[in-house]
Curated annotation (Swiss-Prot):
Binding site for FAD: 50-53, 67-69, 74-75
Role: Responsible for channeling the electrons from the oxidation of dihydroorotate from the FMN redox center in the PyrD type B subunit to the ultimate electron acceptor NAD(+).
Free-text remark on how the cofactor is bound: Binds 1 [2Fe-2S] cluster per subunit. Binds 1 FAD per subunit.
Family membership: Belongs to the PyrK family.
InterPro entries: Cyt_c3_hydrogenase_gsu, Dihydroorotate_DH_ele_sf, Dihydroorotate_DH_Fe-S-bd, Dihydroorotate_DHASE_ETsu, FAD-bd_FR_type, FNR_nucleotide-bd, OxRdtase_FAD/NAD-bd, PyrK_electron_transfer
Name this protein carries in UniProt: Dihydroorotate dehydrogenase B (NAD(+)), electron transfer subunit
NCBIfam families: PRK00054.1-2, PRK00054.1-4
Source species: Listeria welshimeri serovar 6b (strain ATCC 35897 / DSM 20650 / CCUG 15529 / CIP 8149 / NCTC 11857 / SLCC 5334 / V8)
Organism lineage: Bacteria, Bacillati, Bacillota, Bacilli, Bacillales
Length: 254
């Protein structure tokens, strides 16, 4: 974990209120799939950092890409960043996806919903690099909300579901996965709680890994703002920012 200043290389709106932010900094060298950064808004009245998942990184260039949706004052502040600006960053944080499983999977299903899609990109890239056959299933509300379909096709097969049917299959991600004839060796998912519950119920929990989207304040496990009940004892809790955000499905109670 490192508090540092990162330089803005470029920022582009790539979907409705969804921005692609490219940053440069030495902390990229410590990144792994499924981790996140805590970004500090520039406005003095916005005291809390905002957690943004890491979409991808290039360690040789020391750059990373963050994708986020403008949903409040903090992310609205980030959307005003432009080339050569700097931003105060804490991270990389959290325990991400374990891609060094034994035995090594031959097939992997990556399910993302909305702003839970970004961390699936780097994960899929690294799995494909290890020879794993990757299938992406991405869910959005509408075609205007979709992003990174073309980028993901470089590393696997991509399926899209939209609630209004304007792109791909009408419905939810599980309306696609329920028609798959073969069960993958491992399942990874990130997205809204309702989607994660559906994924958890659809596949064997011992080979399903969920990245939880909880509101965070500190990002380092000090404030207990992002807790999640443990599956074996709901009176005990995980701190999502420190113990996760990635958990095996049978470890957590959603």
């Amino acid at each position: 974990m490192l508090q540092t200043e990162m330089k803005v290389i470029q920022q582009t709106e790539i979907a409705d209120k969804v921005y692609e932010l490219i940053l440069s900094g030495e902390c990229v060298m410590d990144m792994s799939p499924g981790q996140f950064l805590m970004l500090k808004p520039s406005r003095s009245d916005l005291l809390m950092r905002r957690p943004i998942s890491i979409c991808s990184y290039d360690k040789s260039a020391q750059t990373c890409i963050l994708l986020y949706r403008v949903e409040g004052d903090g992310t609205e502040d980030f959307s005003k960043l432009s080339s050569d600006d700097t931003i105060d960053v804490l991270g990389p944080l959290g325990k991400g996806f374990d891609i060094d499983r034994t035995p090594e999977p031959k097939t992997a299903l990556l399910i993302g919903g909305g702003i839970g899609v970004p961390p699936m990109y780097q994960l899929g890239k690294e799995l494909a690099g290890k020879g794993v056959q990757v299938t992406f299933v991405n869910g959005f509300q509408s075609a205007k909300d979709s992003f990174y379909e073309k980028e993901m096709t470089k590393y696997g097969t991509v399926h899209i579901a939209t609630v209004d049917g304007t792109l791909g299959t009408q419905g939810f991600v599980t309306d696609i996965t329920k028609n798959f004839l073969e069960e993958p060796d491992v399942i990874y998912s990130c997205g809204p709680k309702a989607m994660l519950e559906a994924v958890k119920a659809s596949f064997p929990e011992t080979k399903t890994y969920l990245s939880l989207e909880e509101r965070m304040a500190c990002g380092i496990g000090a404030c207990y703002a992002c807790v999640c009940p443990k599956a074996d004892d709901r009176n005990k809790q995980f701190k999502v920012c420190e113990d996760g955000p990635v958990f095996r499905a049978d470890e957590v109670s959603l």
